[in-house]
């Protein structure tokens, strides 16, 4: 992101920087992929020479599918999409290699070919059963990171597939491939054997080579992670991409009797595990490679945004730490209060504009308040420049987390204990951090501390929480649970509780492609409306805020545009008992009322209009970053008196992709 993008004319963020990740992700990298070669070249060549005489002429090609979906959001959760379609579970399942299909297909042709054919079929059936065992052994060895056992299993599997291929290439079985009905099953067997060979040569053997050269025991280095080891596995995943696409194309041509489905499915889960790591990581490989780089020095800010002090882009960044890549090791540093990390005011290079001060309030003159702007790219840029101004060190990007991620980390890595004896775990962390600690130390307290001491103590507990959570993530990292970490990251991306901004424009495009940049909608073809709320009064009432949205089915207008009626309901769930127990640090100055800002954005190329409110609330309209926006920067959501805003959003002309809604993440699912 160039600082010059932020002049008073409010030009688009990165508007000239749309990059096709798929075509460019392999260019400009500072490292090359690890190359792997199998040790069984002679045997491999022999097998493939046999297969050249068979009737399997399937060509390798890529098969991609995508599907849009209608998005209805409530409970403050939301999805952030960059336009890239993720694979559904069913589409991912098509990528798996159903080895046991071989057994089923062989049964179909038993008896068709007479005595010789029967003898061959029995032999292939025996070989197919051996394949099942060998595949189980191989998968088990790969999961256990046992390179020696995996090599042994691969050799056995290669030998078995060679035997089946040799049989299928004989004149008798070539003739069988032309027999009506049964012939297509013979060809399917041949195709499936080819898939086994492809998996062995192009996936398993490179994987075993990587495991041998970069064992997972070398992943953790002191208090950090080895960049070389991480890159080796990322390179492996990137290397098998085309192989997976080729297998998908071949699987689409396989025809087997429907009655065999039950028999096949009993083993499909085992085969699915072969590809699960790739399919889970696919969207994030370029992003992760950009983040860690080639081992040369990098510095990132790690902002812990506090949702109890909710802001449009997440929350108040009460504690900020660093992630450093130095001497080939990536490590997480200590967290410190935001005022110790960032300069009080953004430097001139940040170019905070008059329009930004008007739309998002003049508190944007403080660096710490940049997240009043829902565009995380912009907030992160200001934080990065403010850090550089204070410390004289430039950063490569900013990673943002909210307390919900802390709870998800602890659910995998185990509990931590704070200095006051409070245990945080995978079930209670959000409630404790965003509600209970405030009421323990800052209301009806008998701690022997005055207000200032109590505030400092609680801030210290939050900083210690972030530090311990990141430490246990590193120390307790278990590669065998990698899918759980990926799921956690996926959830954070979908909810916008994990966001990432890079200084480098190409790397920032990877974040956009992965859906975690937190940028405002800039793609008319994939429309996304924004519903954002920020607490303005200093308080901790974000715990009690609900943001719920409803969206109608679209109305197709005469000009081809589509209009949606949207209803936003802001609810304050605080009870009188909470109000009477709380002090001013928790409540602010409105006796439990939540005073703040609301910003409602149209999608790229679209419009927003026809505002109606339930209590006369005035909505001002303007334009920011080429997006229409309706907003109010002086509203109060009283307990028991929701603020309801209704309006119409129209997408760009010629766009039939369903509208999605992104909202500021709330804590209502954790109460």
Question: Which residues does each PLM region occupy?
Answer:
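N-terminal targeting leaders characterized by basic, low-complexity, disordered sequences
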Residues: 1-85
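N-terminal targeting leaders only when they are immediately followed by extended low-complexity/repeat-rich tracts
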Residues: 81-90, 302
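N-terminal Sec-pathway targeting helices
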Residues: 88-106
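Non-catalytic, solvent-exposed segments at the cell envelope interface
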Residues: 94-97, 112-670
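Short conserved active-site loop signatures built around small residues
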Residues: 106-112
């Amino acid at each position: 992101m160039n600082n010059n993008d932020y002049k008073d004319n409010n030009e688009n963020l990165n508007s000239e920087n749309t990059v096709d990740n798929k075509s460019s992700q392999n260019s400009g990298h500072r490292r090359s992929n690890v190359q792997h070669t199998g040790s069984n070249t002679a045997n491999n060549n022999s097998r493939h020479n046999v297969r050249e005489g068979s009737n399997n002429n399937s060509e390798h090609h890529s098969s991609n599918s995508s599907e849009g979906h209608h998005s209805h959001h409530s409970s403050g959760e939301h999805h952030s999409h960059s336009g890239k379609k993720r694979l559904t579970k069913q589409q991912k399942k098509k990528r798996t290699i159903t080895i046991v299909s071989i057994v089923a297909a062989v049964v179909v042709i038993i008896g068709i070919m007479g005595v010789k054919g029967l003898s061959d079929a029995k032999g292939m059936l025996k070989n197919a059963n051996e394949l099942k065992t060998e595949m189980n052994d191989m998968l088990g060895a790969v999961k256990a990171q046992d390179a020696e056992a995996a090599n042994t299993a691969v050799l056995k599997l290669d030998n078995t597939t060679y035997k089946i291929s040799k049989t299928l290439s004989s004149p008798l079985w070539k003739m069988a491939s032309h027999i009506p009905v049964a012939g297509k099953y013979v060809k399917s067997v041949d195709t499936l054997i080819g898939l086994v060979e492809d998996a062995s040569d192009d996936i398993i053997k490179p994987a075993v080579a990587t495991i041998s050269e970069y064992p997972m025991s070398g992943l953790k280095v002191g208090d950090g992670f080895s960049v070389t080891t991480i890159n080796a596995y990322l390179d492996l995943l990137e290397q098998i991409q085309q192989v997976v696409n080729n297998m998908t194309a071949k699987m689409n041509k396989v025809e087997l009797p429907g009655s065999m489905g039950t028999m096949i499915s009993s083993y499909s889960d085992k085969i699915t595990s072969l590809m699960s790591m790739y399919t889970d990581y696919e969207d994030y490989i370029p992003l992760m490679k950009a983040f860690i780089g080639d081992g040369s020095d990098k510095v990132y800010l790690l902002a812990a945004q506090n949702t109890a002090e909710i802001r449009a882009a997440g929350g108040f960044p009460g504690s900020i730490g660093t992630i450093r890549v130095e001497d080939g090791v990536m490590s997480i540093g200590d967290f410190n209060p935001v005022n110790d990390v960032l300069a009080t005011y953004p430097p001139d290079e940040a170019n905070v504009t008059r329009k930004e001060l008007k739309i998002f309030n003049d508190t944007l003159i403080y660096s710490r308040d940049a997240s009043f702007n829902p565009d995380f790219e912009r907030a992160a840029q200001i934080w990065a420049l403010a850090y550089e101004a204070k410390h004289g060190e430039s950063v490569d990007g900013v990673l943002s987390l909210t307390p919900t991620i802390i709870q998800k980390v602890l659910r995998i890595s185990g509990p931590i204990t704070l200095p006051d004896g409070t245990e945080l775990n995978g079930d209670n962390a959000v409630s404790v951090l965003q509600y209970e600690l405030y009421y323990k130390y800052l209301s009806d307290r008998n701690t022997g501390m005055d207000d200032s001491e109590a505030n400092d103590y609680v801030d210290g507990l939050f900083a210690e929480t972030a530090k311990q959570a990141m430490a246990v993530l590193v120390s307790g990292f278990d590669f065998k649970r990698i899918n759980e970490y990926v799921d956690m990251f996926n959830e954070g991306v979908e909810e916008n509780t994990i966001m990432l901004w890079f200084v480098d424009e190409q790397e920032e495009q990877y974040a956009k492609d992965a859906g975690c940049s937190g940028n405002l909608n800039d793609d008319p073809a994939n429309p996304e409306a924004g519903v954002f709320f920020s607490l303005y009064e200093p308080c901790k009432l974000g715990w009690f805020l609900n943001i719920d949205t409803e969206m109608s089915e679209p109305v197709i207008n005469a000009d081809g545009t589509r209009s949606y009626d949207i209803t936003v309901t802001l609810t304050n769930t605080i009870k009188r008992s909470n109000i009477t127990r709380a002090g001013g640090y928790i409540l602010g100055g409105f006796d439990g009322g939540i005073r703040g800002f609301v910003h409602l954005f149209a999608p790229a190329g679209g419009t927003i209009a026809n505002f109606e409110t339930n209590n006369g609330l005035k909505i001002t309209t303007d334009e920011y970053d080429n997006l229409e926006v309706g907003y109010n920067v002086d509203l109060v959501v009283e307990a028991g008196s929701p603020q309801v805003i209704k309006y119409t959003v129209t997408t760009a002309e010629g766009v039939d992709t369903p509208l999605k809604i992104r909202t500021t993440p709330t804590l209502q699912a954790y109460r």
